[in-house]
Protein backbone atom coordinates (compact mmCIF):
# COMPACT_ATOMS: atom_id res chain seq x y z
CA UNK A 1 0.00 0.00 0.00
CA UNK A 2 0.88 3.64 -0.13
CA UNK A 3 3.26 4.90 2.53
CA UNK A 4 4.81 8.19 3.57
CA UNK A 5 7.95 8.99 1.58
CA UNK A 6 9.43 12.06 3.30
CA UNK A 7 12.78 11.34 1.60
CA UNK A 8 11.28 11.25 -1.94
CA UNK A 9 12.87 14.56 -2.99
CA UNK A 10 16.40 13.36 -2.13
CA UNK A 11 17.10 10.78 -4.91
CA UNK A 12 17.03 11.67 -8.60
CA UNK A 13 14.53 8.88 -9.24
CA UNK A 14 12.39 6.29 -7.50
CA UNK A 15 11.58 3.05 -9.28
CA UNK A 16 8.44 1.32 -8.02
CA UNK A 17 8.38 -2.38 -8.89
CA UNK A 18 5.18 -3.96 -7.62
CA UNK A 19 5.41 -7.74 -7.15
CA UNK A 20 8.30 -8.19 -9.57
CA UNK A 21 8.68 -11.88 -8.85
CA UNK A 22 11.67 -13.82 -10.16
CA UNK A 23 11.88 -11.63 -13.28
CA UNK A 24 11.88 -8.40 -11.26
CA UNK A 25 15.66 -8.06 -11.15
CA UNK A 26 16.05 -8.35 -14.92
CA UNK A 27 13.17 -5.91 -15.49
CA UNK A 28 14.71 -3.40 -13.07
CA UNK A 29 18.09 -3.66 -14.80
CA UNK A 30 16.54 -3.03 -18.24
CA UNK A 31 14.71 0.02 -16.89
CA UNK A 32 17.76 1.44 -15.10
CA UNK A 33 20.02 0.87 -18.12
CA UNK A 34 17.54 2.60 -20.44
CA UNK A 35 16.89 -0.51 -22.55
CA UNK A 36 13.16 -0.20 -21.82
CA UNK A 37 11.16 2.89 -20.93
CA UNK A 38 9.10 2.82 -17.71
CA UNK A 39 5.40 2.71 -18.52
CA UNK A 40 3.58 1.66 -15.36
CA UNK A 41 0.95 3.84 -13.74
CA UNK A 42 0.27 3.98 -10.02
CA UNK A 43 -2.72 1.98 -8.81
CA UNK A 44 -2.88 4.08 -5.67
CA UNK A 45 -2.19 7.59 -4.43
CA UNK A 46 0.85 8.31 -2.27
CA UNK A 47 0.07 10.96 0.36
CA UNK A 48 2.43 13.65 1.58
CA UNK A 49 1.83 12.58 5.20
CA UNK A 50 -0.23 9.99 7.06
CA UNK A 51 -2.49 12.80 8.28
CA UNK A 52 -3.45 13.49 4.64
CA UNK A 53 -5.07 10.05 4.23
CA UNK A 54 -8.82 9.38 4.46
CA UNK A 55 -8.24 6.86 7.26
CA UNK A 56 -6.09 9.07 9.50
CA UNK A 57 -7.53 8.94 12.99
CA UNK A 58 -9.80 5.98 12.23
CA UNK A 59 -7.45 3.37 13.64
CA UNK A 60 -7.52 3.82 17.40
CA UNK A 61 -5.54 1.58 19.70
CA UNK A 62 -6.93 -1.91 19.83
CA UNK A 63 -8.00 -4.44 17.25
CA UNK A 64 -11.00 -2.68 15.72
CA UNK A 65 -10.66 -0.51 12.61
CA UNK A 66 -13.31 2.09 11.91
CA UNK A 67 -14.05 2.23 8.19
CA UNK A 68 -15.64 5.68 7.88
CA UNK A 69 -14.28 6.76 4.50
CA UNK A 70 -17.17 5.29 2.46
CA UNK A 71 -16.65 5.81 -1.28
CA UNK A 72 -13.94 8.40 -0.65
CA UNK A 73 -10.99 6.05 -0.63
CA UNK A 74 -7.85 6.40 -2.72
CA UNK A 75 -7.83 9.00 -5.49
CA UNK A 76 -11.56 9.69 -4.97
CA UNK A 77 -10.78 11.09 -1.52
CA UNK A 78 -7.83 13.22 -2.62
CA UNK A 79 -9.80 14.66 -5.56
CA UNK A 80 -12.84 15.45 -3.39
CA UNK A 81 -10.75 16.93 -0.56
CA UNK A 82 -8.50 18.76 -3.03
CA UNK A 83 -5.44 17.56 -1.15
CA UNK A 84 -1.95 17.78 -2.52
CA UNK A 85 -0.30 14.37 -2.83
CA UNK A 86 3.23 13.11 -3.37
CA UNK A 87 2.39 10.78 -6.29
CA UNK A 88 -1.16 10.70 -7.73
CA UNK A 89 -3.15 7.67 -8.83
CA UNK A 90 -2.78 6.84 -12.52
CA UNK A 91 0.49 8.65 -13.05
CA UNK A 92 4.00 7.47 -13.80
CA UNK A 93 7.11 8.65 -15.61
CA UNK A 94 8.68 7.58 -18.89
CA UNK A 95 11.89 8.15 -20.84
CA UNK A 96 9.77 9.62 -23.64
CA UNK A 97 6.89 12.08 -23.97
CA UNK A 98 3.39 11.76 -25.36
CA UNK A 99 1.02 14.22 -27.00
CA UNK A 100 -2.76 13.80 -26.99
CA UNK A 101 -5.15 15.43 -29.47
CA UNK A 102 -8.28 14.90 -31.54
CA UNK A 103 -10.66 14.11 -28.69
CA UNK A 104 -14.07 13.12 -30.08
CA UNK A 105 -17.24 11.88 -28.39
CA UNK A 106 -19.85 10.29 -30.63
CA UNK A 107 -23.26 8.90 -29.62
CA UNK A 108 -23.76 5.31 -30.75
CA UNK A 109 -27.39 4.76 -29.83
CA UNK A 110 -29.40 5.73 -26.80
CA UNK A 111 -27.06 4.45 -24.11
CA UNK A 112 -23.64 4.08 -25.75
CA UNK A 113 -20.91 6.51 -26.80
CA UNK A 114 -17.59 6.21 -28.56
CA UNK A 115 -14.77 8.29 -27.09
CA UNK A 116 -11.68 8.62 -29.29
CA UNK A 117 -8.38 10.43 -29.18
CA UNK A 118 -5.02 10.29 -30.88
CA UNK A 119 -1.80 9.78 -28.98
CA UNK A 120 1.65 10.44 -30.40
CA UNK A 121 5.03 9.48 -29.02
CA UNK A 122 6.60 12.95 -29.25
CA UNK A 123 9.89 11.88 -27.69
CA UNK A 124 13.04 10.15 -28.89
CA UNK A 125 12.55 6.74 -27.21
CA UNK A 126 10.04 3.97 -27.76
CA UNK A 127 7.52 3.77 -24.94
CA UNK A 128 4.07 2.87 -23.73
CA UNK A 129 1.36 5.08 -22.29
CA UNK A 130 -1.79 4.12 -20.40
CA UNK A 131 -4.55 6.27 -21.90
CA UNK A 132 -7.09 6.85 -19.13
CA UNK A 133 -10.73 7.90 -19.40
CA UNK A 134 -12.38 9.53 -16.39
CA UNK A 135 -16.04 10.47 -15.97
CA UNK A 136 -17.84 12.82 -13.60
CA UNK A 137 -21.49 12.98 -12.54
CA UNK A 138 -22.99 16.36 -13.47
CA UNK A 139 -26.05 16.22 -11.20
CA UNK A 140 -25.76 13.22 -8.87
CA UNK A 141 -28.67 12.40 -6.55
CA UNK A 142 -26.17 11.39 -3.85
CA UNK A 143 -22.56 12.28 -3.03
CA UNK A 144 -20.20 11.20 -5.79
CA UNK A 145 -16.46 11.62 -6.29
CA UNK A 146 -15.38 14.48 -8.59
CA UNK A 147 -14.19 11.92 -11.17
CA UNK A 148 -13.88 8.16 -11.59
CA UNK A 149 -11.71 6.06 -13.88
CA UNK A 150 -14.04 4.19 -16.26
CA UNK A 151 -11.64 2.87 -18.91
CA UNK A 152 -7.98 2.66 -19.88
CA UNK A 153 -5.83 1.17 -22.61
CA UNK A 154 -2.07 0.74 -22.80
CA UNK A 155 -0.60 1.85 -26.13
CA UNK A 156 2.93 1.01 -27.34
CA UNK A 157 4.50 3.61 -29.64
CA UNK A 158 7.78 4.07 -31.47
CA UNK A 159 9.22 7.62 -31.62
CA UNK A 160 7.00 9.78 -33.84
CA UNK A 161 4.31 7.11 -34.12
CA UNK A 162 0.64 8.06 -33.65
CA UNK A 163 -2.25 5.75 -32.81
CA UNK A 164 -5.94 6.24 -32.21
CA UNK A 165 -7.47 4.95 -29.00
CA UNK A 166 -11.19 4.26 -28.88
CA UNK A 167 -13.33 3.51 -25.84
CA UNK A 168 -16.92 2.24 -25.97
CA UNK A 169 -18.72 3.83 -23.03
CA UNK A 170 -22.11 2.55 -21.92
CA UNK A 171 -24.70 4.22 -19.73
CA UNK A 172 -23.98 1.49 -17.16
CA UNK A 173 -20.40 2.83 -16.81
CA UNK A 174 -21.91 5.84 -15.01
CA UNK A 175 -24.08 3.74 -12.67
CA UNK A 176 -23.69 3.59 -8.91
CA UNK A 177 -25.55 1.87 -6.10
CA UNK A 178 -27.91 3.85 -3.87
CA UNK A 179 -28.33 2.17 -0.46
CA UNK A 180 -31.48 4.19 0.25
CA UNK A 181 -33.12 3.09 -3.00
CA UNK A 182 -31.70 -0.46 -2.91
CA UNK A 183 -30.66 -0.20 -6.54
Feature-to-residue mapping (PLM):
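Short acidic, flexible loop segments centered on an aromatic residue
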Residues: 124-141, 147-149
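A short beta-strand motif that forms part of the nucleic acid-binding face
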Residues: 135-137, 169-171, 181
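Secreted, periplasmic, or luminal enzymes acting at the cell surface/secretory milieu
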Residues: 1-128, 134, 159, 179
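Intrinsically disordered, low-complexity Pro/Gly/Ser/Thr-rich segments with frequent PxxP/GP/PP motifs
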Residues: 141-177
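Glycine/proline-rich low-complexity spacer/linker segments in large multi-domain proteins
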Residues: 177-183
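Short, intrinsically disordered/low-complexity patches at protein termini
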Residues: 65-66, 138, 150-152, 182
Amino acid sequence: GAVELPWADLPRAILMLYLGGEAGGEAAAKLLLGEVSPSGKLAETFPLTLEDTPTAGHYPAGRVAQHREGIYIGYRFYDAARRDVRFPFGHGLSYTTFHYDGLQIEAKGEDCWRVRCRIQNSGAAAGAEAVQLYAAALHPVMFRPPQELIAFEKVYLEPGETKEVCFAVRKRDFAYYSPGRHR
